[in-house]
């Protein structure tokens, strides 16, 4: 089984948290709301990976004014690729508290939508199990 280290930002701006709705045909949690993030590449430093993933998934315009390592967890997930293939992966999640200076988002094709959500409205979204766990650990659910 392949192992991946995943960097995952919990991005907050003016009291709201950024959620991204995964594409219906790919990813670990197709069609569900999630935090952004992705895998660390070989030789890449952790914060470099976090900033790269944010640029790739959310665009160049989003500015993070603060990044703080927060927690980690692991689990085994099945990832679905755009061509329909599936793979079981051991995932280590490194989760960061992030504050953004703006809300300028341009999502890539991994997502179909995004939303800035007030804490009291987070439970109204179809959150994937990993995001639900993270938000509960933070005291937001």
Swiss-Prot record:
<protein>
    <recommendedName>
        <fullName>Nucleoside triphosphatase NudI</fullName>
        <ecNumber>3.6.1.9</ecNumber>
        <ecNumber>3.6.1.12</ecNumber>
        <ecNumber>3.6.1.-</ecNumber>
        <ecNumber>3.6.1.23</ecNumber>
    </recommendedName>
</protein>
<dbReference type="InterPro" id="IPR000086">
    <property type="entry name" value="NUDIX_hydrolase_dom"/>
</dbReference>
<dbReference type="GO" id="GO:0000287">
    <property type="term" value="F:magnesium ion binding"/>
</dbReference>
<comment type="subunit">
    <text>Monomer.</text>
</comment>
<keyword id="KW-0460">Magnesium</keyword>
<dbReference type="GO" id="GO:0047840">
    <property type="term" value="F:dCTP diphosphatase activity"/>
</dbReference>
<comment type="function">
    <text>Catalyzes the hydrolysis of nucleoside triphosphates, with a preference for pyrimidine deoxynucleoside triphosphates (dUTP, dTTP and dCTP).</text>
</comment>
<feature type="domain" description="Nudix hydrolase">
    <location>
        <begin position="1"/>
        <end position="141"/>
    </location>
</feature>
<comment type="similarity">
    <text>Belongs to the Nudix hydrolase family. NudI subfamily.</text>
</comment>
<dbReference type="InterPro" id="IPR020476">
    <property type="entry name" value="Nudix_hydrolase"/>
</dbReference>
<keyword id="KW-0378">Hydrolase</keyword>
<dbReference type="InterPro" id="IPR023781">
    <property type="entry name" value="Nucleoside_triphosphatase_NudI"/>
</dbReference>
<dbReference type="GO" id="GO:0004170">
    <property type="term" value="F:dUTP diphosphatase activity"/>
</dbReference>
<dbReference type="Pfam" id="PF00293">
    <property type="entry name" value="NUDIX"/>
</dbReference>
<feature type="short sequence motif" description="Nudix box">
    <location>
        <begin position="38"/>
        <end position="59"/>
    </location>
</feature>
<dbReference type="InterPro" id="IPR020084">
    <property type="entry name" value="NUDIX_hydrolase_CS"/>
</dbReference>
<dbReference type="GO" id="GO:0036218">
    <property type="term" value="F:dTTP diphosphatase activity"/>
</dbReference>
<dbReference type="InterPro" id="IPR015797">
    <property type="entry name" value="NUDIX_hydrolase-like_dom_sf"/>
</dbReference>
């Amino acid at each position: 089984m392949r192992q991946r280290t995943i960097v995952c930002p919990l991005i907050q701006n003016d009291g709201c948290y950024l959620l991204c709705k995964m594409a219906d045909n790919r990813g670990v949690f197709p069609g569900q709301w999630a935090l952004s993030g992705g895998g660390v590449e070989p030789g890449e430093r952790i914060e470099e990976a976090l900033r790269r993933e944010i640029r790739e998934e959310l665009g160049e315009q989003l500015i993070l004014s603060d990044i703080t390592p927060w927690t980690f967890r692991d689990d085994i997930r099945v990832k679905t690729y755009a061509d329909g293939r599936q793979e079981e992966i051991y995932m280590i999640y490194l989760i960061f508290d992030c504050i953004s200076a703006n809300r300028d988002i341009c999502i890539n094709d991994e997502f179909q939508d995004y939303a800035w959500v007030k804490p009291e409205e987070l439970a109204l979204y179809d959150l994937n199990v990993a995001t639900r766990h993270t938000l509960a650990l933070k005291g937001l659910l």
